[in-house]
């Protein structure tokens, strides 16, 4: 007896349609090669008759097994996948609105400097209206764009300022409402330009995985680059926005990797050189079917071997001294590394020697003490000749030699040298 297939509910049908729609332009395998492609698996099961319940079970099991962050990425990809791509004429119109938004924000920034505080939205809108009304009055029948200094000069005139105030006061609500609508439309245009190109960010971010930043961080940094591209895009140049935005997205991601992926930050130019060395090494390995030598890589990169070695050493990641060593993991890497600097015991001994030496020198006369300090560099570490010391004291080098000899004889007395003998090993 043939079993009747259970029909899908409206919500379940919509959910399956979203999965099928998403799979047309997003390959989640690129996110992690070790993961199962749940979309493909679901579609295969859904293609067989009467398996809708199994589809839902597979989806729930997959979500349970995946970490929260990966599931968040999946939801994010689904959301941006529903956003329609822009047509060329739409890009141009949105770019014009974004340019208008930047002009409005520039007026706000100038007003902030003028008022020495953040202006209210009403003050901002009023200033925009004044500037544009002044521009219209200056243009008149000339149909020539007035310069900024001409507009500023017009507004500086008290009569013109009073005239603008009176005209604004006749319809303040209407003028302010028009400004707010204009601001809303411009901001929405910027959001639409950015949201419609978020898939481009994901596509570029995938190429920079496993370089020290998580996939979520790469998407976030790339999105900041996309926002910057939307603000800088000039539609009059004739190229597509996606072509222009690609450079800004890549720049934002590579700079973030250089700044955040390493404990010890490397300059951006050095990080870019490291990336080129890696690409060159991979290319030479494919061509020669063996690991290239340092000389071959340096020749291909047109740099010296010394510079190549320096960059390669800079690219090494630091290792924590707390890294466990051995099967039992009861030892740490720091236990096996000899310290290059002085031990605490040596430092204490040196401080005690310095104190005792000062006490012994204080038993000499001031001139004898100063001569020994200069002769043996006790103050600055530089030993001076008898001639140099003689010039300082304005006496002959022979006199300095006599003072030195007398001071050393005093120091050899048992009452003095017994203290210092303890430091001789």
Swiss-Prot record:
Origin, by domain of life?
A: Bacteria
Q: Does the keyword Transcription apply?
A: yes
Q: Where is this region: Sigma-70 factor domain-3?
A: 272-347
Record GO terms (molecular function): DNA binding; sigma factor activity
Matching InterPro entries, A to Z? RNA_pol_sigma-70_dom, RNA_pol_sigma70, RNA_pol_sigma70_r1_2, RNA_pol_sigma70_r2, RNA_pol_sigma70_r3, RNA_pol_sigma70_r4, RNA_pol_sigma_r2, RNA_pol_sigma_r3/r4-like
The UniProt keywords, alphabetically, are:
Cytoplasm, DNA-binding, Sigma factor, Transcription, Transcription regulation
Show the segment(s) annotated as Sigma-70 factor domain-4: 360-413
Residues of the signal peptide: none
Q: Where is this motif: Interaction with polymerase core subunit RpoC?
A: 217-220
A Gene Ontology cellular-component term = cytoplasm
What are the DNA-binding region positions?
386-405
Q: Does the keyword Repressor apply?
A: no
| Alphabetical list of Pfam families matching this protein | Sigma70_r1_2 (PF00140), Sigma70_r2 (PF04542), Sigma70_r3 (PF04539), Sigma70_r4 (PF04545)
Per the record, the GO terms for biological process are: DNA-templated transcription initiation
Q: Where is this region: Sigma-70 factor domain-2?
A: 193-263
Q: Where in the cell is it found?
A: Cytoplasm
Protein function:
Sigma factors are initiation factors that promote the attachment of RNA polymerase to specific initiation sites and are then released. This sigma factor is the primary sigma factor during exponential growth.
Q: Which family does it belong to?
A: Belongs to the sigma-70 factor family. RpoD/SigA subfamily.
Q: How does it assemble?
A: Interacts transiently with the RNA polymerase catalytic core.
What is this protein's name?
Answer: RNA polymerase sigma factor SigA
Q: Which organism is it from?
A: Synechocystis sp. (strain ATCC 27184 / PCC 6803 / Kazusa)
Gene transcribed to yield this protein: sigA
